[in-house]
């Protein structure tokens, strides 16, 4: 009987060990499962509100920098354009006087004194033209050219032999450009 009790005790111990071992493996599995969840949770890090704010501030800073660079570029371009065309207002005011000079030079003098006066006016006119040329002002070419609405203003249309359609027949008032900008369009007669 003592042997039977020993066997029963051993059987119970073995069963308990199996249960304990089984229990251990369940705990191990649970621990493994929990650690797997923790790994998954670690893969998706929690974004801290301060990090979000930092990223937003970095984005705003980048936009402000870009805006500032655009502002600097625009300001520089405007200053360059101002310097390039600084004389435009003065030249626009000078053009009517230049037109009157040209008309005066077309008059045929009858007296010797008038001829000398005309020669002096021609010298002054050439000096004014040269000064304008040095500032980048040049007359717009017209006669024989094809009509260009960006450069010319058609005042009359005529039908003349020897001219192509849209070819300028006569210049009625001289036009001028300051560098690449038209100050005043040429007034012209255009062939139909």
Curated annotation (Swiss-Prot):
GO terms for molecular function: adenyl-nucleotide exchange factor activity; protein homodimerization activity; protein-folding chaperone binding; unfolded protein binding. The keyword Ribosomal protein does not apply. SUPFAM superfamilies: Coiled-coil domain of nucleotide exchange factor GrpE (SSF58014), Head domain of nucleotide exchange factor GrpE (SSF51064). Residues 1-59 are annotated as: Disordered. One of its GO terms (biological process) is protein folding. One of its GO terms (cellular component) is cytoplasm. Disulfide bonds: none annotated. Keywords: Chaperone, Cytoplasm, Stress response. Coiled coil: none annotated. It comes from the Bacteria. Residues 15-25, 45-59 have a biased composition (Basic and acidic residues). Residues 1-14, 26-44 have a biased composition (Acidic residues). It is found in: Cytoplasm. InterPro entries: GrpE, GrpE_coiled_coil, GrpE_head. PANTHER family: GRPE PROTEIN, GRPE PROTEIN HOMOLOG, MITOCHONDRIAL. Belongs to the GrpE family. Homodimer. Participates actively in the response to hyperosmotic and heat shock by preventing the aggregation of stress-denatured proteins, in association with DnaK and GrpE. It is the nucleotide exchange factor for DnaK and may function as a thermosensor. Unfolded proteins bind initially to DnaJ; upon interaction with the DnaJ-bound protein, DnaK hydrolyzes its bound ATP, resulting in the formation of a stable complex. GrpE releases ADP from DnaK; ATP binding to DnaK triggers the release of the substrate protein, thus completing the reaction cycle. This is Protein GrpE. It comes from Shouchella clausii (strain KSM-K16). The gene is grpE.
């Amino acid at each position: 009987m003592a042997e039977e009790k020993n066997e029963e005790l051993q059987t119970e111990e073995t069963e308990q060990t199996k249960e304990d071992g089984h229990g251990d493996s369940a705990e191990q599995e649970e621990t493994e499962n929990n650690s797997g969840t923790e790994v998954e949770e670690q893969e998706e890090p929690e974004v801290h509100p301060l990090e979000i704010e930092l990223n937003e501030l970095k984005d705003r800073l980048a936009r402000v920098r870009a805006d500032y660079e655009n502002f600097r570029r625009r300001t520089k371009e405007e200053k360059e354009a101002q310097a390039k065309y600084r004389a435009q207002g003065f030249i626009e005011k000078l053009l009517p006087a230049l037109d009157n000079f040209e008309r005066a030079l077309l008059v045929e003098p009858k007296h010797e004194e008038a001829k000398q006066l005309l020669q002096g006016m021609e010298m002054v006119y050439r000096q004014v033209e040269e000064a304008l040329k040095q500032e980048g002002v040049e007359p717009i070419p017209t006669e024989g050219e094809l009509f260009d609405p960006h450069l010319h203003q058609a005042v009359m249309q005529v039908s003349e032999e020897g001219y192509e359609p849209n070819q300028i027949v006569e210049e009625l008032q001289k036009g001028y450009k300051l560098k690449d900008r038209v100050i005043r369009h040429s007034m012209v007669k255009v062939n139909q």
